[in-house]
Amino acid sequence: MKVFILALLALAATTAIAQLETTCSQGFGQSQQQQQPGQRQLLEQMKPCVAFLQQKCSPLRMPFLQTQVEQLSSCQIVQYQCCQQLAQIPERTRCHAIHIVVEAIIQQQSQQQWQEPQQQAQHKSMRMLLENLSLMCNIYVPVQCQQQQQLGQQQQQQLQEQLTPCTTFLQQQCSPVTVPFPQIPVDQPTSCQNVQYQCCRQLSQIPEQFRCQAIHNVAEAIRQQQPQQQWQGMYQPQQPAQLESIRMSLQALRSMCSIYIPVQCPAPTTYNIPLVATYTGGAC
């Protein structure tokens, strides 16, 4: 009898998975074509979470099991799969996975269902998603996930302007100051040292929960300004190059400013990019 019940449960799970694949295949087709390989893999892994959060599952009817076992629904099976997949994703990359889930849900929802601008709707979805997944799966999701998403376009632009000294310093676009009186027995400051000081001071004034976003903006500004040939170890497509520059910026700013930057800052570990790339630009 136990073998019979287990076989029926396995059949129910198989049916639920088949329903999930049928439901998701159409919605994910277009978005996956635009995703990078690492993102596509994460999106595939998080399909059960997308299906569950959209409530695209319905109870399975198994009347002959009423007296034997508790009725399992396809929603319960998909919920279990979602939590299982999320638990297998390293903590430092869960933010990235959740971002992908939110984008997939918003792309599949008709625009008429949102009564507010899409960006605000995305922030609201992120908050709801974090609450649901944390409670539903009893799993740790970094707090920075939500806080990073609450920055609007204007705030991001302000952050980028605020950290212009960091962009300048990391690009090594500063040169020693010519001092007419070198005989003075004092270490002569250079423009690089001045810019470094300004960078660290500005970064320390940014709240901890927003430093990740600020560094992302700095790295993106550097990547856009530098010719592709100046980066060794950066190849197409663009996304790995951006992630590598974020990682380089993190390393430089952590050691240079002696300031706290959340460990979860980059989600780029999914792409297996080396920790260090060689920069061939000028030096101070």
Curated annotation (Swiss-Prot):
The record ties this protein, via CDD domains, to: AAI_SS (cd00261)
Q: Could you list the residue ranges that cross the membrane?
A: none
Q: Does the keyword Disulfide bond apply?
A: yes
Q: Which residues form the signal peptide?
A: 1-18
Pfam families listed in its UniProt record: Gliadin (PF13016)
Q: Is Ribonucleoprotein included in the keywords of this UniProt record?
A: no
Q: Matching SUPFAM superfamilies, A to Z?
A: Bifunctional inhibitor/lipid-transfer protein/seed storage 2S albumin
Q: Which residues form a coiled coil?
A: none
| Key words of the record | Disulfide bond, Seed storage protein, Signal, Storage protein
Q: What post-translational changes are documented for it?
A: Contains disulfide bonds.
> Which InterPro entries does UniProt cross-reference here?
Bifun_inhib/LTP/seed_sf (IPR036312), Bifunc_inhib/LTP/seed_store (IPR016140), Glia_glutenin (IPR001954)
One of the record's GO molecular function terms: nutrient reservoir activity
Q: What does this protein do?
A: Seed storage protein. Might be integrated via inter-chain disulfide bonds within the glutenin polymer.
Question: Per the similarity annotation, which family is this?
Answer: Belongs to the prolamin family.
- Protein name from the UniProt record: Avenin-like b9
UniProt source species: Triticum aestivum (Wheat)
